[in-house]
From Swiss-Prot:
Compartments, as annotated in UniProt: Virion; Host cytoplasm
Entry keyword Chaperone: yes
Biological role: Non catalytic polymerase cofactor and regulatory protein that plays a role in viral transcription and replication. Stabilizes the RNA polymerase L to the N-RNA template and binds the soluble protein N, preventing it from encapsidating non-genomic RNA.
UniProt source species: Northern cereal mosaic virus
Record PTM: Phosphorylated by host kinases.
Name of the protein this chain belongs to: Phosphoprotein
Cellular compartments per GO CC: host cell cytoplasm; virion component
Amino acid sequence: MDKKASGISGENALFGDVPNDVVGTTYEMGLDGIFDDGETDVIESPADAEEHVTTDIVADEGDNLITKVDDMIGYLKRECQDHGIAVRKEWVNVLTRKFHMSKKIYASHLDFFLLGVMGERHVAVEKDFKDTAVRLSDEVNKMSGISKKVADNETRMIKELDAKMKEMGSLIGKFNGVLNEFKGSMAVSSRPASVASWALDQTTETSREKNYNEFLKKLGFQDHHIKSPLMKKCTVMITDEMYDEVMLENTSEDTLGIYKEQIITYGQSIQKKVEKPIKKDPYADF
């Protein structure tokens, strides 16, 4: 069988059940409908459409329908309480006005209203949080600057205090040196002239000779200087304050140097007096 014969046979098989007396209808595009067959269709109004709603559908929609203002306010308060939100009077006024305008309101309307309120609250909280974070950052920067200034001032004050303390220590050392020199000169001038008193002083000095040796060592004198007769004469200028201060190691290196210089100066003055030339007696030969 050729292809043409096969095609005709397939077409007859496809439309074999269609009756031969079917008459086609002509449709024309009109302004009042998408497909207009010449007849006028009646379009139902919304009111007519509502009349055709069955009782079962109204019952289903009435499950969430709020018909009283008090019920609406009660529902709003319960939902707000569940979400931890305080009801505002302005919200009640807005919803009441909306209820009276539409004569009906659904619970879903209130849910969307609360979603809007919560969204606005979240945005406000986020903005406040950002503003607070910015203010805290500014305050932290200010406090950091203040802390740095305080630290710098503290360091400067410590340095100034150290300098003042060193200056005061130096002045105190000089003052002690002058005071000890004065006390030494007073001790020399007030030395007893009687033989008995002199012998008593010599006995006392001899008993403390070992301690004086230690005292002189702390000042930096060598052993041969300490044991010299001239040094023994210099011990009279050593005051109790000088002795205790040096032996207890309560003095500075500068003060030790001052004490040593005073003893050397005193020894030199004694040596000059001893070496002073004696005038020859013109009558010695007679």
